[in-house]
A protein has these predicted regions:
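Residue(s) in the substrate-gating loop at a strand-loop-helix junction
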Residues: 140
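Conserved glycine-rich cofactor-binding loop
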Residues: 9, 14-18
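Substrate-binding pocket helix/loop in short-chain dehydrogenase/reductase
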Residues: 72, 96-98, 104-109, 135, ...
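Alpha-helical segment proximal to the catalytic Tyr-Lys
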Residues: 125, 169-170
Length: 207
């Protein structure tokens, strides 16, 4: 199926593995040129090289911590005028309500709320000027059905949902759409970690 996006340019965060990598491969399969970002340079470049070889699209890789101002500046400078933005970040650690303090919530908000907002604000003006843009935020099914051990994630991602609900309506007339993806269970490193934590807390085998 041709989605009509061949030749577009996309920035995809946390794209060296997992859902971000899957999004990158899907967009590359549609002929979209990519800017990939993750913190680990080695795995990021391996993913970029694989996509270049497989799909023949332009792929630039920026290893940086996207939750920092310096990291955002580096990624956005390389990305330039993008047509598609996919925000994505690893979820905060699981735990109990009594485990989390103010610093834990601030870290969760930085990664899963404030960073996507900063990238959206940086990308929207150009998209609106050109009359076309697609922004997709990978959040979690926990936004609709909160998961008890993921209180940090539940809180931050719900905040992003509220922000996007308002902004998407404000910019829809400019040819720009903003949507959230709420993935459920996928075979990723994140799910393996959560299973280990849950099994340990319940004193049972991971199997």
């Amino acid at each position: 199926m041709d989605l009509g996006i061949r030749g577009r340019r996309a920035l995809i965060c946390a794209s060296s593995k997992g859902l971000g990598k899957g999004c990158a491969e899907a967009l590359a399969g549609e002929g979209v040129d990519l800017v990939l970002n993750a913190r680990g340079a080695e795995s990021l470049e391996a993913t970029a090289a694989s996509i270049r070889s497989t799909y023949g699209v332009s792929v630039e890789a920026v290893a940086a911590d996207i939750t920092t101002e310096a990291g955002q500046a580096a990624v956005l400078e390389t990305a330039g005028d993008i047509d598609i933005l996919v925000t994505n970040a690893g979820g905060p650690p699981p735990g109990l309500w009594s485990d989390w303090g103010r610093d834990d919530f601030i870290a969760a908000f930085d990664a899963n709320l404030l960073t996507p907002i900063a990238l959206i604000k940086a990308s929207l003006p150009g998209m609106m000027d050109r009359g076309w843009g697609r922004i997709v935020n990978i959040t979690s099914v926990a936004v609709k059905a909160p998961i008890p051990v993921l209180g940090l994630s539940n809180t931050a991602r719900s905040g992003l949902t509220g922000y996007v609900a308002g902004v998407s309506r404000q910019v829809a007339g400019s040819g720009v759409t903003i949507n959230n993806l709420l993935p459920g269970l996928h075979d990723t490193d994140r799910l393996v970690t959560l299973d280990k934590v849950d099994a340990g807390a319940r004193g049972i085998s991971e199997d």
